[in-house]
Structures are given as C-alpha cells and as structure tokens.
Amino acid sequence: MKKLNFLLWATLVSLNSTAYAEVKSFTPHFPKFYSSATTRKADNQFYALGEAKFLNGVAVPFYGITAQNPIEDGLLFKLDAQHAKQLKLLALPEVGVVLVPRNWQDIQANAGANGTGFALIMSPDQKQAIKLYDSSFCVGCGLPNATLYFPELLKESLENEYGGFKDPKNLINIVHPSKKVAFFSYQIPQVNNKTHGIAKYDDEDTFNYKEIQVTLDKSQQSLVGPILNFYNATH
C-alpha cells in the first residue's frame, strides 16, 4: 500500500511539474509591429552606407538601421569628470566600445568575414596609438596571438599547427589577475613612454581572444588608466 501511495504521489508530482511547459498548436499568421509608427521612426532610422556590390557586378543601395541603445541609461562604470572632458567613446565593428582621446580622428578599422575585428586609432601626429583586436570565433586567429601573454597555450597552438609567440628576452612585463586575463606593458624602442595593455581569452564554447594596446605620451598618461579600466570592464 505504501508503495502504491508513493507511485501515486510520484505520478502527481510528475504531472504537476510538466504542467508548466505548454505545447501550442501552430497557427500561420502575418507578423505585426509591436511599437507605434512614431516610436519606430524615432528608434529605427536609416543611414546611408553607400552601395553593396554583388559578385556579378550589380549594386544595390546599402543602409544601416539605428536601434535603441541598451546602455543609453548609463554605463556601469565610473569615469572621472576631468578625464571625461578629454575622452570620447567609439563603437568599433566586431571590437566593441572603447574610450579614446577626444581629439583623435585618424582611424583604421576592419571587420573580417570570419567575425574578427581590428582597429588602430592614432593621434594627429601619429606618435600615440590605441590598437585593438578581437579574434571572434576564429581559433586559428586568436590562439597563436594569445600564446605571447598566456604561454601555457603554446603547446595547444603548436599541436594545431597555428604557431605562436615567445618572449625570450623578457621584454614584456605581465601580470595575471586571473587565469584568462593578462595586464601587460613593454617599451618600444625610440618611444618615450611604455605601451600598456590587456589581453583576454575565453575557451568555454570556442576560443576567443581580444587585446588592447595603449601608447600615450607624458601629456596623456593620466588617460591610460581610465581607457584600460573601461576596456576591462566592458569586454
């Protein structure tokens, strides 16, 4: 009798636990906007990007569409007011957002077909620079670059015939606050100030590697910390 009661209880629990997962019948329907025309006009604006050319030579107009910014209510990062006067925020293709000196305008940014992102932003005199890279899901792009700051990855990279990097002269000073994050600095010959940067990797699903290098002169050294701290907090 006890066994029967237990089975009955187990059955009821099973029925109750599955009652929350509803299976609905498919019904064909035409899609509808869930926002008003006024809201769509304000949030989703067209901006021209030129032309997109296809393999057979034909071209069509190319447009981007704006969307509501999920961070417009404020970034979860505190920035000193004095530093804010000297900085601006850039959104870079396949790289993300980064703080750079406000008067910098010279930039090269590329997005690869495999999702990789690269950007180089330079001062007007091209003597200061911020360089960024994100390997996206390209393991062969990210893993060899990561070996410079994470030597324990070199064996895996070589086994996969990706190659890698070493620092036999100990030119780079590296601190690992955690296993997959590296803070680094090094001196470039004929450059007055050191380059500081952050390298990170994530190998939970596939291998992703990202890096920022910041080289600023003495007049802008106070901005190195905010730029790197912001990158570390948002990437």
Regions found by a protein language model. Name each.
Residues L4-L15:
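Sec-dependent N-terminal signal peptides
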Residues A84-K85, P93, P101, T116:
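Extracytoplasmic
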Residues P93-A109:
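Proline-anchored loop/turn motifs at beta-strand termini and strand-loop-strand connectors
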